[in-house]
């Protein structure tokens, strides 16, 4: 199969990323108005455009300024970055494995990061230490999956997938064990809430961590977008066109692991974003990754930010965002699967 018309972008997609970028900026401003302490949109715009970049000395006696700059701004930035990273990861993984059912959690990174986060909570470590251990554990899970795949003698797609399932299952069992051993009055509620996913603990330090990882890994994925297109054609065709399939696949999975580990480390479990958002982006711009990756990033930021707005504004008590992304994502994915099942992954 050659790079046919399906690999070309759809008509009118040149402006999609621009429109989505404008939409995400407006949604971020609107999100700053939401919450238990309402702040009018005009006040939000004034605060943002007069104090950004963030001043070292702020007006801490001004309640709206504190709410917007100190409480809501880091959360909204963190949510947006995580949504963008997860969506780009999902789009890349679906291209690498030529399978629309693949998500960025396939290598066991999410479970590994969850194990690190739970262990840090059990040890009463401070928030940034939880982020660090969760991030390191996620990368450790990826290394374990790679090593296990190597034991098969051939790093095939199937070996990588099965290795990720094995490592993820093992890490999940350890998480369950730690929950069983946790103090039911103090530690267990914190662990359960963290695993369900929440951005309530967002800080500018966490934003800096995720921003650094997202900029690095996202830029690397964009630089490799043409190579991902080759992998989407299949291993044989990609190799015939000059791609080092094994090295490229492993490198891409490493970049995805960085993004997923960064997200889990700051917010706990947030699923379905990397699975459904690339499908929506593909419906807008087609499967060609030079447009699919940036479009997925914008849609991912919009989707997760909208879910977080609902999570913190719909009820008196904040809803764990992982519950919302699952509750909304599952029926959306079911609809997309029904809509596209007869069309296949890539049309001839």
Question: Predicted regions span which residues?
Answer:
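Alpha-helical transmembrane segments in inner-membrane proteins
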Residues: 2-348
């Amino acid at each position: 199969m050659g790079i046919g018309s399906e690999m070309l972008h759809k008509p009118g997609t040149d402006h999609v990323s621009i429109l989505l970028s404008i939409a995400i900026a407006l949604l971020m401003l609107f999100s700053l108005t939401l919450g238990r302490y309402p702040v009018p949109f005009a006040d939000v715009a004034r605060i943002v455009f007069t104090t950004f970049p963030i001043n070292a000395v702020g007006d801490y006696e001004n309640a709206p300024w504190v709410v917007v700059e100190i409480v809501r701004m880091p959360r909204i930035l963190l949510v947006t970055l995580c949504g963008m990273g997860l969506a780009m990861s999902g789009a890349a993984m679906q291209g690498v494995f030529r399978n629309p059912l693949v998500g960025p959690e396939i290598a066991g990174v999410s479970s590994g990061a969850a194990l690190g986060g739970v262990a840090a909570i059990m040890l009463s470590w401070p928030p940034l230490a939880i982020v660090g251990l969760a991030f390191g554990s996620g990368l450790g899970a990826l290394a374990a999956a790679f090593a296990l795949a190597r034991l098969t003698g051939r790093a095939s797609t199937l070996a990588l997938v099965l290795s990720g399932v094995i490592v993820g299952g093992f890490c999940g069992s350890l998480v369950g064990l730690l929950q069983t051993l946790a103090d039911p009055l103090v530690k267990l509620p914190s662990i359960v809430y963290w695993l369900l996913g929440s951005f309530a603990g967002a800080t500018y330090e966490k934003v800096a961590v995720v921003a650094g990882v997202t900029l690095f890994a996202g830029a690397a994925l964009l630089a490799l977008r043409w190579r991902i297109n080759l992998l989407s054609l299949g291993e044989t065709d990609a190799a015939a066109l000059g791609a080092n399939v094994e090295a490229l696949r492993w490198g891409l999975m490493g970049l995805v692991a960085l993004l997923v580990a960064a997200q889990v480390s700051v917010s706990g479990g947030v699923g379905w974003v990397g699975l459904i958002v690339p499908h929506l982006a593909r419906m807008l711009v087609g499967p060609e990754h030079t447009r699919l990756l940036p479009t997925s990033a914008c849609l991912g930021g919009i989707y997760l930010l909208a879910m977080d707005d609902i999570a913190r504004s719909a009820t008196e008590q904040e809803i764990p965002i992982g519950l919302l992304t699952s509750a909304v994502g599952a029926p959306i994915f079911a609809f997309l699967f029904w809509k596209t099942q007869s069309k296949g992954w890539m049309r001839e």
